[in-house]
């Protein structure tokens, strides 16, 4: 019992598993006031609980401060949805991402939850990074480069990055970007500022939690809304 309680405190978003929700109306994942819909997993805080928070609310925005590195994860699991985010880098360009289908925490490099990342890294918004999961795209040989002897996959040492279609859809630094992610079954489609930037199929998973990264750069989010899919 004592061990189970300790594990729950260390990795609160792993268990118990919540029912999987398919949205029927728009839901604001961030309510503008608090982080009651989220749980943070910041590995460095295991050894130093006094570290500053990685995620704060400032001026009505959700802010990923970038460090200490980690993830802010929804309490709820979702499937078949449209996720719209509006974000901007506040200082220097840098790295961040939205993770969909998040499940097992710290599944890669003792940091990243098992998931499929939709990249927000400056200049590369819309790349996929697979984390102990997988997905396929057209032109795999071209868009998923691998070194000799390297295989496609989501584990350490695998070719995990899948290049986007544009690398030119982001707005200048400091301006707000809109990223839309649609999840239909095992397909994931991504738009940045109206441009189609990625479309993957045959994902290894079709549901899970949603996570925001703290990965070195400060990023503000003024909108994180999940809702039903539009008609095809």
Model-derived segments and spans:
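Carbohydrate-interacting regions of secretory-pathway proteins
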Residues: 15-232
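Sec-dependent N-terminal signal peptides
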Residues: 3-12
């Amino acid at each position: 019992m004592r061990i189970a309680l300790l594990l729950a405190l260390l990795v609160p978003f792993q268990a118990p598993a919540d029912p999987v929700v398919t949205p029927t109306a728009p839901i604001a994942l961030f309510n503008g006031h608090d982080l009651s819909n989220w749980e943070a997993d910041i590995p460095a805080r295991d050894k130093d609980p006094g570290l500053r928070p990685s995620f704060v609310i400032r001026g009505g925005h959700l802010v990923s401060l970038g460090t200490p590195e980690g993830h802010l994860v929804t309490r709820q699991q979702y499937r078949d949805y449209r996720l719209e985010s509006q974000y901007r880098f506040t200082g220097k360009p840098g790295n961040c991402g939205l993770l969909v289908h998040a499940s097992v925490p710290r599944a890669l490099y003792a940091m990243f939850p098992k998931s499929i990342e939709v990249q927000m890294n400056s200049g590369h918004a819309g790349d996929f990074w697979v984390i102990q999961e997988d997905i396929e795209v057209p032109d795999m040989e071209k868009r998923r480069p691998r070194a000799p002897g390297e295989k496609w996959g989501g584990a350490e040492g695998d070719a995990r990055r899948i290049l986007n279609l544009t690398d030119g859809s982001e707005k200048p630094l400091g301006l707000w970007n809109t990223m839309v992610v649609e999840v239909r079954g095992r397909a994931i489609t991504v738009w940045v500022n109206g441009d189609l930037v990625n479309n993957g199929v045959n994902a290894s998973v079709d549901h899970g939690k949603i996570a925001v990264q703290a990965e070195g750069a400060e990023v503000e989010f003024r909108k994180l809304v999940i809702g039903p899919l539009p008609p095809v």
